[in-house]
């Protein structure tokens, strides 16, 4: 069951109605997959798409964890005999894990603290006396509480003990913590300084050696860069609660917040100085340390979430890149001393030939003859060249082959080889090619990923594809969960050929486990090709529920029923039968008949189970059966004579392929072995909030070279072709830093966060985001 308040919360967050959320949760709890629900249960969910469902799934998990923790806390406090009606009401009302833990803090079992020791020593009456009645002189009052046998040796020890009691009491006040937390989040700065003596060793973090910026607005890439610097022992991070002052003040404004909350008024009474000291201790020793850790954790969590989302978007774009299709392809895995590895696959992706050539070590003529012979023998239409070391040299070699052998007409394409080496050494590659040398397997992968990027890349751990922003600095569990969802959604959006798909590809189909995928391939090997979807039920361990989830995403071309090659689910075949009866046409005549299908009204074919959304989808599918949602295949043409960074000149206009998109811009491969950066401010003449709205991985773009830094291996590019090299770095058309409103401007202290212009001298994260070779 789903809590009604949870339904309302999630509905507001995903722009849906509570009843839609409730219906989706029921479907998920029944074991239905997100791709299945999104495509085949639109009537029940009101048309929630896969993105909404994924967000719902994530938020639902959080809220259920919250509820489980809430019940555990209520039980714990109740067993202590301290659960009041007001406390129970507050605990039941909160929807934040942080607030929940704040409420539990005073009752949470903990090690003996100094405050507890002081209470055991009988000092609580002293603490209450001095706090409530400041007319008492602290030293005089404390003299009555000196108990040497209890560890209270003198009045100073008694007063310190009383301070600890009050400090711990106030630091566990949930309402007080909420006020200070809110102030810090809105006003504090995150401060980064270099650890003394680490300047040279940590040079890549030098932009953060003396840096501060508002805590709540620090971009994810800068936050993760600073956290990485701290983890490597180069940077120290802290919070400045009072950034409006040049130097840290003697008293923080947070101390005033604490005093106001506690109703403390100072009137020069004998105990006022001591009480002021209690407030100072509460802030500096307890609250600041607690909230600094917590808020930095919040910043890191937000930064990690953004980084994971960036990775997910880039992975989605890479997986959904245009396939070259059923064309015989040669894969060239470039190398210098070790040679260029060659693999030829036929139109179906089957490996038909391999070789190793040495065009860069004095054997170019022999290598050219080998390539030409393979191209002619196997009717090669495309040549995929890996983009790693010696890529441009290998590309130039192939162009020479075409000049020498006019019959070699296969189009060359530079292909990202990220992850190819990981695949080569994997258990899966060993199973596919047990007798093939590891070094040649990479060439096979390069060829196949040009034919069908999705089918080949699913064989590789997404984290090895290298299109992520600080992917090694984030929660690997959350990253894996997110990326698995992306792969699943992409595979099911495209659909899978049941008779040719590999085990890794089948494993990503909704409802199928790895064991089921293996059993499908085993059944196929033993019985030949599937002729209809119903034969899936003959596969071991694939029962009715799994069939329901997977059948619509599995295609059978040239089988018994043309509908088996479409996205129409077998459960909806009766709807098609009604359409055929109404149009008095045979299925093969109706499929693709746009003029006939566009005259149909979806509402004429609905029933209790299938409403207008599903029938509309069926009619669209009949019009264009088996349509591929991926774009048309296009390639970037790198400029002749531009092969290394030394060949680049400011002002050059080049064509390139977007390899990676981050929150601060896009990296573009222009064929010089080092991706250039188009900063967010140079993506468009209009303001750009999110680079992903302008470009995506795989896009072919025209760029102008603005700056080349050979020493740091930085290339600054712009997609605003009217932008001139050397122009000011001030933001003109975009960027993601906005003015701070509703708060006094902080005076500079050290280096403030600067709007990073489109300079090759970006901070260290440009290196981290560079192409993985």
UniProtKB/Swiss-Prot annotation:
Alphabetical GO biological process terms: nucleobase-containing compound metabolic process; response to ionizing radiation; translation
Gene3D superfamilies: Nucleic acid-binding proteins, RuvA domain 2-like, Tex N-terminal region-like, Tex RuvX-like domain-like, YqgF/RNase H-like domain
Sample GO molecular function, one term: RNA binding
Record SMART domains: S1, YqgFc
Keyword RNA-binding: yes
GO CC terms in record: cytosol
The name this protein goes by in its record: Protein YhgF
Organism: Escherichia coli (strain K12)
